[in-house]
From Swiss-Prot:
Coiled-coil ranges (or none): none
Protein family membership: Belongs to the bacterial ribosomal protein bL32 family.
The species this protein was found in: Edwardsiella ictaluri (strain 93-146)
Keywords, in A-Z order: Ribonucleoprotein, Ribosomal protein
Single GO biological process annotation from the record: translation
Name of the gene this protein is made from: rpmF
One annotated Gene Ontology cellular component of this protein: large ribosomal subunit
Keyword Ribosomal protein: yes
Entry-linked NCBIfam families: rpmF_bact (TIGR01031)
Protein name: Large ribosomal subunit protein bL32
Xref: HAMAP family: Ribosomal_bL32 (MF_00340)
InterPro entries: Ribosomal_bL32 (IPR002677), Ribosomal_bL32_bact (IPR044957), Ribosomal_zn-bd (IPR011332)
Gene Ontology molecular function: structural constituent of ribosome
Length: 56
C-alpha cells in the first residue's frame, strides 16, 4: 500500500486542485431560429450559423 513520505501542505493541495474547477457550457443563440445550442454544434432543428444544414 502506498504511504506518503511527507505531509502535503494546504498550499500544495490547493495549487494542485486549482485546475479542477468546472465551467459552465458556452451556449449560443442561432441567428435564424433563435434557438439556443452549444457553440460549434448544430441546433435541434438543423441550423448551423444561420443556414439549414440538416433536412428533417
Amino acid at each position: 500500500m502506498a504511504v506518503q513520505q511527507n505531509k502535503k501542505t494546504r498550499s500544495c493541495r490547493g495549487m494542485r486542485r486549482s485546475h479542477d474547477a468546472l465551467t459552465t457550457a458556452t451556449v449560443s443563440v442561432d441567428k435564424v431560429s433563435g434557438e439556443t445550442h452549444l457553440r460549434h454544434h448544430v441546433t435541434a432543428d438543423g441550423f448551423y450559423r444561420g443556414r439549414k444544414v440538416i433536412a428533417k
